[in-house]
């Protein structure tokens, strides 16, 4: 499909694929193979030299993965995409692609616990540091930028507090300083928000969540916006000749430079590859993405209203509420609403009561995932954000009494009844 005027609901079903030319299969075939036969020795040489973009080995690329990547790129409005083994791998590769020893990134402090530890604990061991800032004021990002800063990073909706950032302002700051904006858009999906239209240059997703949607597959994806000048003098790995590929200069690849370098270098050398089978499952999920997100959001709005009016609930952290400090930004960037993952706190913020409430839930499952068709609940302070200290938890918007919900697509009256009976028991 080359017509860029197709609407989202059509692209999520068709983008990146035509019926199989050999068999006529309408569904995307699963190419469950490690390797691909070359026509002759010259053909093999051309592929290894990146002169022929077709598949060599499934760690680097696979026809099933190709469809998934093209479809995601189309839905996000990007130039290219790369599927990898997990959302964490997508984030790691996005940073390692542009930063090295002595460099830093500036990141919002409101992050998923695993990402926070990647930035604060793991990447520093490789010489890459992170300056965490309160994202409520865009000036905090600008004040943290120095000559070694390689990117600004944030999540579209912070995990788990649902904070909203002034994306346009951040994009303008990054552009002024000649650095890219890398955005984790897992919680919003391309259904409700398009980061490339608001200053982003690279998007990462945990495809495990809404993209897959059914809690069956692990994977991540990196989307290249094709809208950043990697030859601006700040990124020598893109402008210096890479001798492992006969002197190629990745910046000369233009709008596909970012993901091509990850595929050619990082994926080749460190191998966090996406399984073709998982790509195939993600493609099944994508076909109903907008339909599921619509139900996720409609259910969430009713549950937020229920909890906000419950006498045992002190606070509901969702920006759709007029009382929420992010409501104005939410209205600006999400006119059709977004966010089916949110937190709430009981009246006394008691940790035991919060954990007891979760244990009393019957439909909501206690597990470490979000964006599933099934409704989920968890206690972040003791699980997903356990590695953070008290100050870091507070910076991420989490207390010992915080409960996180990921609202599924079940009948909302059943979900409210489940929450009501659990609240009655504490």
Each language-model region and where it sits:
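Conserved PLP-enzyme active-site core in the AAT-like
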Residues: 2, 12-14, 18-21, 81-309
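N-terminal "arm"/small-domain region of PLP-dependent enzymes with the aminotransferase-like
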Residues: 2-62, 70-71
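Conserved N-terminal alpha-helix of the aminotransferase class I/II PLP-enzyme fold
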Residues: 40-89, 114-122
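Glycine-centered tight turns that cap/initiate beta-strands
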Residues: 77, 148, 312-315, 363, ...
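PLP-dependent enzyme catalytic core of the Aspartate aminotransferase-like
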Residues: 120, 147, 348-352, 375-426
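Well-ordered beta-strand positions enriched in small/hydrophobic/aromatic, beta-favoring residues
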Residues: 152, 220-222, 316, 342, ...
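Short hydrophobic/aromatic beta-strand micro-patches
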Residues: 223, 343-345, 406-408
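Conserved small-domain helix->loop->beta segment predominantly found in fold-type I
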Residues: 270-273, 277-279, 284, 288, ...
């Amino acid at each position: 499909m080359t017509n860029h005027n197709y609407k989202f609901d059509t692209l999520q079903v068709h983008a990146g694929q035509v019926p199989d030319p050999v068999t006529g299969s309408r569904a995307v075939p699963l190419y469950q193979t490690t390797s691909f036969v070359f026509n002759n020795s010259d053909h093999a040489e051309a592929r290894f030299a990146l002169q022929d973009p077709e598949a060599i080995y499934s760690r680097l690329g696979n026809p099933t993965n190709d469809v998934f990547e093209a479809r995601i790129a189309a839905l996000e409005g990007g130039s290219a995409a790369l599927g990898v083994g997990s959302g964490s791998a997508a984030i790691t590769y996005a940073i390692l692609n542009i930063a090295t020893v002595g460099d830093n990134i500036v990141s919002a402090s409101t992050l998923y616990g695993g990402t926070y530890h990647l930035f604060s604990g793991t990447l520093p061991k490789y010489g890459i540091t992170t300056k965490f800032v309160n994202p409520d004021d865009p000036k905090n990002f600008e004040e943290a930028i120095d000559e070694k800063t390689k990117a600004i990073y944030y999540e579209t909706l912070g995990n788990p507090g649902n904070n909203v950032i002034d994306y346009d302002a951040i994009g303008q700051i990054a552009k002024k300083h000649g650095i890219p904006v890398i955005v984790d858009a897992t919680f919003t999906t391309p259904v409700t928000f398009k980061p490339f239209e608001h200053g982003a240059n690279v998007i990462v997703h945990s495809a495990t969540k809404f993209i897959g949607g059914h809690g069956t597959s692990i994977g991540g994806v990196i989307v290249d916006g094709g809208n950043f000048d990697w030859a601006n003098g700040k990124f020598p790995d893109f402008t210096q000749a890479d001798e492992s590929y006969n002197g190629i200069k990745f910046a000369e690849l233009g709008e596909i430079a970012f993901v091509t370098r990850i595929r050619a270098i990082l994926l080749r050398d460190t191998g966090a590859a996406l399984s073709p089978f998982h790509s195939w499952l993600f493609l099944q999920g994508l076909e109903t993405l907008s339909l599921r997100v619509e139900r996720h959001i409609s259910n969430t709005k009713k549950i937020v209203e229920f909890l906000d009016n419950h006498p045992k609930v002190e606070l509901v952290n969702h920006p759709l509420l007029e009382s929420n400090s992010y409501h104005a930004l939410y209205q600006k960037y999400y006119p059709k609403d977004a966010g089916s993952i949110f937190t709430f706190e009981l009246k006394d913020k008691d940790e035991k009561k919060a954990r007891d409430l979760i244990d009393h839930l019957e439909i909501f499952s206690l597990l470490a995932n979000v964006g599933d068709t099934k409704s989920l609940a968890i206690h972040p302070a003791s699980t997903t954000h356990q590695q953070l200290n008290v100050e870091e938890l507070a910076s991420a918007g989490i207390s010992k009494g915080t409960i996180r919900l990921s609202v599924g697509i079940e009948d909302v009256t059943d979900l409210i009844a489940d929450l009501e009976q659990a609240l009655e028991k504490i």
